[in-house]
Amino acid sequence: MSASHILNSIIAGSDMAWNQDKQRLLVQGEILVETRSHKAWGGAVTAWMYVPMVRSQVWQQLTDYPRWVQYFPDITKSEVIHRGEAKRLYQAAQKAFLFFTAQVEIYLNVVEVLGQQIQFRMEKGTFEDFDAHLELKDCGNGTLLAYTVQATPNIPIPSIFIQQAMNFELPANMRKMRQVLCKAQ
């Protein structure tokens, strides 16, 4: 199956106009991002990234949840608090804004579909809502990773600012994630 066919199947649910140039950029290392609004004070984003590693290796590292502090610099703690069929995670993060630093924490229910996807749903935390989804697909000799997040903070920040922050920060975080994943190879 060609990388182009796989890319088209992954992005079929997206509103983004995909073409050969965007697909080529993705395989060459670009992070492609699509933001959208989510409630009045929230935002949603999907980022796509190609990782030049086989899916089983990527999966093994992504499901090592304490390592997420290496992937996302704002995450200060990531720990599994319950193992089993349904995992529970605790994550804490700190983000500096213009004149203040926001500290957040979240308890997540995690559902894994072995080697294919990870779903994170907020159980409780300092968000009004939070939902994230990671999907992995084979793509040539590597893996295509799609990461979707939708969140609404407890503090009223206009949606446009949340979307801009997601659009700016998620690609940098994804590059860091790819760097850490490939370094461990």
Regions found by a protein language model. Give the residues of each.
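Generic detector of well-ordered alpha-helical segments enriched in charged/polar residues
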Residues: 8, 23, 162-163, 167, ...
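Glycine-rich portal/gate segments that line the openings of hydrophobic small-molecule binding cavities
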Residues: 4, 36-41, 50, 69-124, ...
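Short, well-ordered alpha-helical segments
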Residues: 57-64, 168-172, 176
